[in-house]
Amino acid sequence: MTKYIFVTGGVVSSLGKGITAASLGRLLKNRGLSVTIQKFDPYINVDPGTMSPYQHGEVFVTQDGAETDLDLGHYERFIDINLNKYSNITTGKVYSSVIRKERRGDYLGGTVQVIPHITNEIKDQVFRAGEATGADVVITEIGGTVGDIESLPFLEAIRQIKSDVGRDSVMYVHCTLVPYIKAAGEMKTKPTQHSVKELRSLGIQPDAIVLRTEMAISKDMKEKIALFCDIDDKSVIEMRDADTLYQVPIALQEEKLDQITCNHFGLDCPEADMEEWKGLVNKVRNLSKTTHIGLVGKYVELPDAYLSVVESLKHAGYDYDTDVKIHWINSELLSEEQIKEELSKVDGVLVPGGFGDRGIDGKIEAIRYARENNIPFFGICLGMQLASVEFARNVVGLSQAHSAEINPHTPHPVIDLLPEQKDIEDLGGTLRLGAYPCKLVDGTKAKEAYDGADVIEERHRHRYEFNNVYRDQMAEKGFVFSGTSPDGRLVETIEVKDHPWFVACQFHPEFTSRPTRAQSLFKGFIGASVDYRKG
């Protein structure tokens, strides 16, 4: 029978609930259990697809094309699984589903209420996550903080699930903060006590409490928390700040959270073999070289907007014993002199995905500088589109070439709308989303990066595409179309001939990178950047 773990948070946000949930998932997977994981977000947006990166950070795209919370990236990277559309549920999505059912008459004229209709819909989403994957364990993170009005329907739903499936099949893990008061020279447990009291007032008794802390927590303090929160002191778990995220699963194993979980469910599972993971942590802590990458974007004040890109660069660095240092370069503020000054300091240039016209000229000029000065360049999604525009302008001679997204009246729309996108009016959920195959061309850097694979599969999130009207004209000047859709219609990867490493792709390879298995194009890019640094 499927087991359900619910991870809640108290006191403050950004405690690391997502990392805790992902780490526990990794430990249980390494014990031989199949695991899936999901996140409930209490905001009323249907999904984060149309939200500003300043508000929400990056949008993580799943294999089946769902636009989701960035925590799903942590889940996939830690547990090494592919998630799906059931893995991120928002209040907006729940209410949309219930309202559609009401309009269809599914409720037979009854009054539609938060309880039972909204809570039943939430419970259905939990159960679907398990049914879709056949997982032994479903881990659900509840976004927000206990006490928030927005989270109440979710907390009520997970309270009810204990009655639906039996108390032996449900476990509640509560994450809280134990602050250190510098003036008093001591840590305080009161916030944790009050947070658990609030949770218990909603009918949920935590089975384990994870304490986020800067310093070691004494046995006496654990016993005090256990006493006031009515929990076994062995189930009070210390989670100290770590120098790398990938240390957290090891720390939680040392605190025996996975064993406590197995005991709670009555599961007899072998000890989790974490030797490979410990090797990863040891490697991360002892990198001997440094490579500098210039990331040119418009959301550089908020690194979470490019979280998966940053993690993928780091993963690739691990394979080269290299610590990747990122230089955040704001494309809106780049003058010609600044481009030379900033990019002369780096070993590689990356232009990631994005939307809109802000900062476009700075990105195009950065791409030109990388191309003309033989600096390794990697473009992703918008980065590929702008690399095409730059080449069309400065090599082919189409000085007014542009993307139709940025300038709908350009005489040379090198980048244009996909035909199926031309009559779409809604922004949300209407992009080309999810995993699609790409056929690679022999003798190209893209095919070399993928170890000679003929066809690869990567995730997409875009509305515009390379305009095939310009394909022959650009190919004649050394623009290489190294990957296309299997039917040859859509351009997926491009390169520049006779450049040490100038590769760009329409898809988002950052979504498939793993800490123990770097994504192929990122690995190729960092390898080229390491070589560039050597001179």
Swiss-Prot record:
Biological role stated in the UniProt entry: Catalyzes the ATP-dependent amination of UTP to CTP with either L-glutamine or ammonia as the source of nitrogen. Regulates intracellular CTP levels through interactions with the four ribonucleotide triphosphates.
Domain Glutamine amidotransferase type-1: from-to ranges: 292-535
Parts of the chain that traverse the membrane: none
Active site: C381, H508, E510
GO cellular component, one term: cytosol
UniProt binding sites for ATP: S14, L15, G16, K17, G18, I19, D71, R240, D241, A242
The organism's place on the tree of life at top rank: Bacteria
A single GO BP: 'de novo' CTP biosynthetic process
Keywords: ATP-binding, Glutamine amidotransferase, Ligase, Magnesium, Metal-binding, Nucleotide-binding, Pyrimidine biosynthesis
Catalysed transformations (reactions): UTP + L-glutamine + ATP + H2O = CTP + L-glutamate + ADP + phosphate + 2 H(+); L-glutamine + H2O = L-glutamate + NH4(+); UTP + NH4(+) + ATP = CTP + ADP + phosphate + 2 H(+)
Protein name: CTP synthase
Residues that coordinate or bind Mg(2+): D71, E141
Extra information: CTPSs have evolved a hybrid strategy for distinguishing between UTP and CTP. The overlapping regions of the product feedback inhibitory and substrate sites recognize a common feature in both compounds, the triphosphate moiety. To differentiate isosteric substrate and product pyrimidine rings, an additional pocket far from the expected kinase/ligase catalytic site, specifically recognizes the cytosine and ribose portions of the product inhibitor.
Binding site for UTP: S13, K188, T189, K190, P191, T192, Q193, K224
Residues covered by region (Amidoligase domain): 1-267
Chain's gene name: pyrG
PROSITE patterns listed in its UniProt record: GATASE_TYPE_1
Annotated EC: 6.3.4.2
